[in-house]
Amino acid sequence: CRLFSAVVAGNLERARGGDAGARAALVRADDLLARALLPATSLCPANPATAAQLWACLAPLPYADRFRAFAAHRAATAASPLLSAAARLAVVETRKILRRLHAPADRRDRRDALAPFGRMLGKAAAGAPLAVVAAVVAQAEPYPNMIDPCVDALRYAGPLALDCLTFVLIDRLASSGRPKLKEDGVNIADWLAALASLAGTLCRRYDGVDVRALCQYVANTLKESDPYDTLVLSELVATMAGIPPTPDLSEGQVAALAGGPTLVEAALSLSTGSRAGGARARARGAARLA
């Protein structure tokens, strides 16, 4: 993996300079990741060090190439009985962990209560990250009250698992065949609202979730005249920057938004109350969105 990551990094530099041979080498590297390295990881006993080395191979690649490798790995898993069996075992183990999650009201008690399950989930995700995070999203989507416990339980998941989580989120958001409005034709469907809330909570909590990929997905849906996924962007801004939607701003508040940070903070607090998170966390979240 160390040699592979060095080769990928070198070819990326040459590909940016227009080297056709380097671009061809990157295509072969993507194929090797999808057909060999990712499947081999899912068949080995869970080992965070192995997952970290695999992430070192993937990290230099653009997110589009990484997600393409994840999609190819998922297709290969569906076509292979051995890989499918390994994925099913990981899903069964993940569901056992998720069924035991609970969220005490006190934040410190919640952290202590979820820490053992988070460690178990992190170990499972080191072996089969794609299957594990898909099970987590499938659990949180129909049960919005499970979003916070599931996000807290991912505390010990590595960067590879979080990148797989970004891929799974975008894949489920883009899955066709599900109406994005309720039967009344006015309100957003529950599944879309839950996924948007999950995306916002994950991006606020973990830097390993790729905000650029989510924002690019929203931009692509807008180009296709699909406005409903802007709910994802709204959740990202609300949770990461602490700026919830404010439809009823007065003229004075609108004018105050053109001022400095302190004036903007005061103007928004008048309409929304106290903003989520501390000032440092909001500044870090806003910087990631910029």
Task: Say what each PLM segment does.
Residues 1-290:
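Eukaryotic alpha-helical solenoid repeat scaffolds
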